[in-house]
Amino acid sequence: MIQATLLISLSCLSFYTLGSGVRRYDPGQGVTIQYLSLAPDTFDDAYVGCSEEMEEKAVLLLEKEMANHTRLRESWETAQKAWEQKRAGLTLPPGFRSQHGIAIMVYTNSSNTLYRELNQAVRTGGGSWESYMKHFPFKALHFYLTRALQLLRGGGGCSREPRQEVFRGVRRIHFVPKSVGDSIRLGQFASSSLDEAVACGFGSATFFSLRTCSGAPIQALSVFPEEREVLIPPYEVFVVSNFSKDGNKSLMTLSSSDQMCSHFNCAYLGEKKRPSCEFVPIGGQGDSLSKGAFSLLSWKTLLLASWGFQLLGAGL
């Protein structure tokens, strides 16, 4: 199965560049090589235990941020009009609000560059809580998009339904794991496709075959439904199952650990950055866990590791 996956294609999907580790330039190949990691500088809030409070705060927060960011305001207004036409024909999960759908349409509209700005901010915006509060310009959009994926995917992670196989590629960057078996995060909102043929039309430098537990199918809400997109949140932890080189192409298989890890939780409400990335099951998202339960689960996970049980990321 793994070998078959790695032989899939020689020119594969490239939706958006992801960033997770140290970069170096290889002048002999004319490409950037980037090592995958747990992406410690990512803003990775999953809003565990505070999603309802954030729903209340985000309304005014979005207005404030749109007033300070012209492209955000224009993109949101365009998506809002499109959403009003699209929403009538959709069957949406309980709790799914218009803002969640609009956020997805904002993100998938590649006619503007807002998705790139958002992901650049996500990749680098988690250096500190103070930096997030002062300089992260998409707090409301990040919340709405994160919450949309949680609601569309549903609770329970892979305990509720099996890992979903998707494909993703990146042009101009060769992503490399430090070793097979590493735990890594993609470190941004990462687009992928259910359709390998679609995936192979987007790039060739790095090809990922992924099995995700928290990626959500957004085809019905996307500006480009024909891409059969599955959007993966920044906090999902993957294990590198296999890696190979085929000429100047990197081929990698990632399998979800069915865990998320976050340095941040409810940051906008005052929760500071944790010194280590705390692991909890993917099923414990939104308000299904309290903030206290999130911390307790994380502490127990680390304790089990010290007793010699398997912990994803222990070798990093």
Swiss-Prot record:
The keyword Protein transport does not apply. Keywords: Disulfide bond, Glycoprotein, Glycosyltransferase, Membrane, NAD, NADP, Nucleotidyltransferase, Secreted, Signal, Transferase. It is an enzyme of class 2 (transferase). Its EC number is 2.4.2.31. Residues 70-261 form the TR mART core domain. The keyword Transcription regulation does not apply. Residues 1-23 form the signal peptide. GO terms for cellular component: extracellular region; membrane. Glycans are attached at residues 68, 109, 242, 248. It is found in: Secreted; Membrane. It comes from the Eukaryota. Gene3D superfamilies: Toxin ADP-ribosyltransferase, Chain A, domain 1 (3.90.176.10). The active site is at residues 168, 191, 229. NAD(+) binds at residues 107, 168, 188, 222. It catalyses: L-arginyl-[protein] + NAD(+) = N(omega)-(ADP-D-ribosyl)-L-arginyl-[protein] + nicotinamide + H(+). InterPro entries: ADP-ribosyltransferase_ARG, ART. SUPFAM superfamilies: ADP-ribosylation. Disulfide bonds join 50-266. One of its GO terms (molecular function) is NAD+-protein-arginine ADP-ribosyltransferase activity. Belongs to the Arg-specific ADP-ribosyltransferase family. This is Ecto-ADP-ribosyltransferase 5. It comes from Bos taurus. The gene is ART5.
